[in-house]
Design a protein with these regions (language model features):
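Cytosolic, long alpha-helical scaffolding segments
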Residues: 1-167
Length: 167
């Protein structure tokens, strides 16, 4: 859950990169997320090697449950990395106000998608997760349209690629 909180803050900070110079904060949060990811990996590895201990301490029933935690941690860590990169490219790019507003709108859609996906994970709502996976394609198409309209802008390819990877 700490990684989730960090990822949400990073997405929000990346979204406001045009208005605020917060790239250093994003960079620091990414290091925190990386540290927590490796800690989670070590804990999961311990749990797989010592299932009885983990079962007693954390009420975890199976190795499958541990692997689900690993998948969630990997997903969140990827989101953190791509949010950091997207913020870097937004910082480097020179967009007009219309482009900035459109990009912030896309970022808001991605942020909503991430929050809803994590909610589906926490509540174990598979149906919601599957619907969100289907709606992901729509956001990717919005990213592609944004790229096509602005393909002559510096860093746009890298930025759009990171936005699409964030989902």
């Amino acid at each position: 859950k700490k990684m989730d909180v960090i990822a949400r803050a990073m997405i929000n900070d990346a979204k406001t990169t045009f208005d605020e110079d917060n790239y250093e904060n994003i960079e620091q949060r990414d290091r925190d997320a990386n540290r927590l990811f490796f800690l989670a990996c070590r804990a999961i590895k311990f749990g797989l090697r010592n299932p009885l201990t983990v079962s007693q301490l954390f009420n975890i029933e199976s190795g499958e449950e541990l692997l689900n935690y690993r998948l969630a941690a990997t997903y969140i860590e990827k989101v953190c990395d791509t949010a950091k990169r997207a913020a870097r490219y937004m910082h480097l790019a020179k967009f007009n106000e219309k482009q900035k507003k459109e990009l912030i709108k896309i970022f808001t859609q991605i942020e909503y998608q991430f929050i809803e996906m994590m909610d589906a994970y926490y509540t174990n709502n598979r149906e919601k997760a599957l619907k969100l996976c289907d709606s992901k394609e729509e956001i990717i198409q919005v990213c592609d349209k944004f790229y096509l309209k602005n393909r002559n802008s510096d860093w746009i390819g890298f930025l759009v690629n990171n936005l699409k990877t964030m989902m």
